[in-house]
Amino acid sequence: MAQVLRGTVTDFPGFDERADAETLRKAMKGLGTDEESILTLLTSRSNAQRQEISAAFKTLFGRDLLDDLKSELTGKFEKLIVALMKPSRLYDAYELKHALKGAGTNEKVLTEIIASRTPEELRAIKQVYEEEYGSSLEDDVVGDTSGYYQRMLVVLLQANRDPDAGIDEAQVEQDAQALFQAGELKWGTDEEKFITIFGTRSVSHLRKVFDKYMTISGFQIEETIDRETSGNLEQLLLAVVKSIRSIPAYLAETLYYAMKGAGTDDHTLIRVMVSRSEIDLFNIRKEFRKNFATSLYSMIKGDTSGDYKKALLLLCGEDD
């Protein structure tokens, strides 16, 4: 049975964009800022509603809501609120653009987004990227990456994964054998084989291939990837396998490692919490609880502070 996906943020009932715009203006007018009002309001409205509030704010006060928020807020809290205000359909494209911009490339962001988005989502991201930035996402990725890592990203960006249909057992067997021969049984590794199979076969087919692979080789496919590849390609192949197995579980793990140990990767924490809040954050929470000895809520609570913490906990919903 397919998992029913649900977010933690939904449309606010009895929504009134003008009243909300007035609340926000009041929170920022005069001396000091009422952060509590801002975070409570914005985390309880859907992204579409936030865009309506923004429009009402301009109509009522002739001011840009985002500019006002940026000038009143600071630090990680500001970054989180700015992310919440970005139109959903632009958010992934914006994150990818920033991962590709400037001196270094942020491969972590490229890997996470491109590996965990569905073909439909990737097609939408490519279109928005081109409209917003006047260049093709694929061209920008090619210009900023290299080798097999680049090739795998390009294959995924084609968004031509087979649709889920009936399982062809013979094809499952053939792909599992091909992967075994391309990795464990070969001196060196035939990366092309991994890229083609991982990048084009359907999700249900690949899940069967991973099971069959275990039967044939005695290894989980992740163990083979770990042994046979390295660097960015290894990270990307692992992200693809984990996303094929379960996108919420992969993103739960991403959140866990963003907070585990010394220091917090706030960029990742904000990106996943915001981008999934209306899609599958509820499922991510459940996977988090299942796979780690704690809940997402309590980990955020122990790892963050101040208004930033309050806003993240409201996005998270309740403790599991």
Curated annotation (Swiss-Prot):
Record keyword Plastid present: no
Modified residues (N6-succinyllysine): 290
Cross-link (Glycyl lysine isopeptide (Lys-Gly) (interchain with G-Cter in SUMO1)): 29
One Gene Ontology cellular component annotation held by this UniProt entry: external side of plasma membrane
Annexin repeat start-end pairs: 15-86, 87-158, 170-242, 246-317
Cross-link (Glycyl lysine isopeptide (Lys-Gly) (interchain with G-Cter in SUMO2)): 29
Residue ranges of the motif [IL]-x-C-x-x-[DE] motif: 314-319
Residue positions where N-acetylalanine is found in the record: 2
Gene Ontology biological-process annotations: blood coagulation; negative regulation of apoptotic process; negative regulation of coagulation; signal transduction
PTM statement from Swiss-Prot or TrEMBL: S-nitrosylation is induced by interferon-gamma and oxidatively-modified low-densitity lipoprotein (LDL(ox)) possibly implicating the iNOS-S100A8/9 transnitrosylase complex.
Positions where Phosphoserine occurs in the chain: 37
Alphabetical keyword list: Acetylation, Annexin, Blood coagulation, Calcium, Calcium/phospholipid-binding, Hemostasis, Isopeptide bond, Phosphoprotein, Repeat, S-nitrosylation, Ubl conjugation
InterPro entries linked to this entry: Annexin, Annexin_repeat, Annexin_repeat_CS, Annexin_sf, ANX5
Family statement drawn from the similarity comment of this UniProt entry: Belongs to the annexin family.
Protein name according to UniProt: Annexin A5
Source species: Homo sapiens
